[in-house]
Amino acid sequence: MLKSFKTEIDPTEEQKIKIHKTIGTCRYIYNFYLFHNKERYDAGERFMSGKSFSVWLNNEYLPGHPEYFWIREVSSKSVKNAIENACTAFSRFFHHQSSFPRYKKKGRSDVKMYFVKNNPKDCLCERHRIKIPTLGWVRLKEKGYIPTSKDGYVIRSGAVSMKAGRYYVSALVDIPAPEADGNLTDGIGIDLGLKDFAVVSNGTVYRNINKTARIRKLEKQLRRAQRKLSRKYENLKKGETTQRANICKQKLKVQKLHHRIENIRTDHINKVISEIVKTKPSHITIEDLNISGMMKNRHLSKAVASQKFYEFRTKLKTKCAEYGIELRVVDRWYPSSRICHCCSSIKKDLKLSDRIYRCTCGYIEDRDLNAALNLRDAETYEVA
């Protein structure tokens, strides 16, 4: 099976220049593909696929425009992957899965340097370093995390990314699939929410990490840093003596705070999933939440986005597949909070402010725990 490993790297100054150059070229090619297809559409011509654009770019456009020689100086695999990503964005738009593709702005877009294993010695990994095509050997900050080539593991592909002044490598490694454990316990249900991040049917409650003093302190620092950056831009517009170098420094401070908060939230999700999977349930049932609809509520949108429900579901699905656990997804219209777990009656007048579920049969339970129990015992579901 293929498994991804992502860790921070410590490139040299020369390697940093190559990474910046490759990422910048990939961003330019992505935007050029969008622009070229827009021009063709305005001229009444047919849409050009990614493969056709790659042939046209290399055989017709670049030979006639020698000033763009720098495109050929970076890895061709990275350029081709940027074209494929742009083509996928158009495909999603044509199938009404997303909006029209937008240009990637410098410094604000998640563009990666893609690499692939073509030869046996292209991608190798040792305990303290990794070999990347066009970069050579790059030191790893976390030693021993990526499986080494010495132990027989093979890196199929990967990507180098940059965020808040830090560099990361993500490697796709071919590893043997773990054996399914036959000693599984009873199934569980998980109710996700805003008051608590997750309530499990076995009684375990995972707190909302965004309500902790640690996150609130960082968010306060972030608001101050953003105000400081905004004032620098205002002074620059007025023609005062704010230097552009100081703006870049302040932008980096804001990016580091964003990155720190995101890492804490992601780490919390990873630990919750790991703890749930270690209980070895036969199945896990979750609800198909309408995240896009919840985001339309301006009073809840920030809280919903901070919980990262979609990332939780994606990672839980991967872990369940890895350990042989069945992941069940219940329809979003299933009234898990309104059903009494004792007598199965539906309480139609239940309000969002009612945190305790009280049924006429005498059953009293926490609202979220009652929902988790109903999800565990749901009979109508889809296997993710």
How would you name each of these model-derived features?
Residues 18, 22, 78-82, 268, ...:
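Short amphipathic alpha-helical segments
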Residues 38-42, 94-100, 282, 320-327:
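Surface-exposed helix-capping loop/turn segments at secondary-structure junctions
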Residues 33, 82-93, 369-379, 383:
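Stable alpha-helical structural segments in soluble proteins, enriched in small hydrophobic residues
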Residues 30-37, 41, 90-97, 196, ...:
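A generic secondary-structure signal for well-formed alpha-helical elements
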Residues 1-79:
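Gly/serine-rich nucleotide phosphate-binding loop at the start of the catalytic core
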